[in-house]
From Swiss-Prot:
Active site residues of this protein: K83
Name of the protein in question: Probable transaldolase
Keywords carried by this UniProt record: Cytoplasm, Pentose shunt, Schiff base, Transferase
Gene Ontology BP, a term: carbohydrate metabolic process
Pathway stated in the Swiss-Prot or TrEMBL entry: Carbohydrate degradation; pentose phosphate pathway; D-glyceraldehyde 3-phosphate and beta-D-fructose 6-phosphate from D-ribose 5-phosphate and D-xylulose 5-phosphate (non-oxidative stage): step 2/3
Keyword Cell inner membrane: no
Amino acid sequence: MKFFVDTADVKEIRELNDLGLLDGVTTNPSLILKSGRDIVEVTKEICSIVEGPVSAEVTATEYSEMMKEAAALSRIADNICIKLPLTLDGLKACKALTSDGHHTNVTLCFSANQALLAAKAGATFVSPFIGRLDDIAFDGMDLIREIRQIFDNYGYETEILAASIRTVNHVKEAALIGADVVTAPPATLKALVKHPLTDKGLEMFLADWAKTGQKIG
């Protein structure tokens, strides 16, 4: 499974990348706003930190304007992945961009039907939103399961990028079901390492080692 981080915070991206955990980055207009930086400036810096795909989202809603914005975003760096909304215009742009050799991430997916359309449009990634479905009492993992079965049935190469990940359990469940990628906030990715028995065991080992009076090296 690939791990993407969902942030435009360069400090957090550097830290996770140095740990060897990152396969890519996803951003959106809300995260750019939170960063307080110019979209081109911050996206270019992010692309210089990670080798994997960096999703940068268009804000236009009409096909022709989407294509103009996609052209501008793609000039930022070679590892830009154009993020598009799951609308008819977004799918049309996805097809055109994919045919032209660009990587694409079709976002705001909330149904298996939508995911199927994204795959048919040639999307590199489709991003089903887990947490937001949970908010309306729909099990987001059921959606991942449905998409996985459909893609496997027909051999679609579009990767399932589980988004709106809010807990470490979301990560585990997405991995068990077969999502290709999860994108999560920095805090959630860091929390994956935590377990109380790990902390307790380390504390015990260090206490016992101190009693030996020895040093290594």
